[in-house]
């Protein structure tokens, strides 16, 4: 997409960050003590072993603790890998979590002081882990309140995305939580990826261009590549107006997964011309 200097990044996998709301007598009213360990530190495994935790579907084992021997010669390849710390190749820019409607909904059920303490522990570079990335969806995802895009109804022929509008998931939950996180870590990099394009942009196949009125599967209609690119830019600009700067976008979440709750099949042969649009 030839718009400003926004980077397009392809992510093979994403980590979903969800905070589970637990029912208890004090629920979300009491502050969370993040400093006092609940148990004594685990003992260091015996030299040459690794600690294991096993859970089986039949319930016989549930986080059963054990040890596994390392480098005992059994089933080991005859090749030795040596690490040279002086040789450096690609670098890792950072690590992060997905910020979804469900996680933000649960966070907003918490006492504000407890929520602030939790977010500081995760995102603060001085008082916490210093998590440097957050991923949000461009439209709905697995953890949204429902299926939607930001332009479910096609606009005019001259401006097909004239009906673009953020959904309540973003306005009432994701954006407020992102602002809280950014107040803790202003250098946080936010990336976005769509699960699906608007349904009116979908076709069953790119040759016949038969319409595909479905949240799952389907292809991006080649006729709408430029329109969909403008949809991305519109999202970036609208989020900026709301105080959220998008660092990078990915063309498609799980591009080969046709069966997700919302999905768009986008193999590289179709993704490449879209990125160039």
What are these regions (language model features)?
Residues 251-257:
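Short, conserved phosphate-binding/catalytic loop or strand-edge motifs used
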Residues 259-267:
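Short glycine/threonine-rich loop-to-helix capping motif typified by GTGT followed
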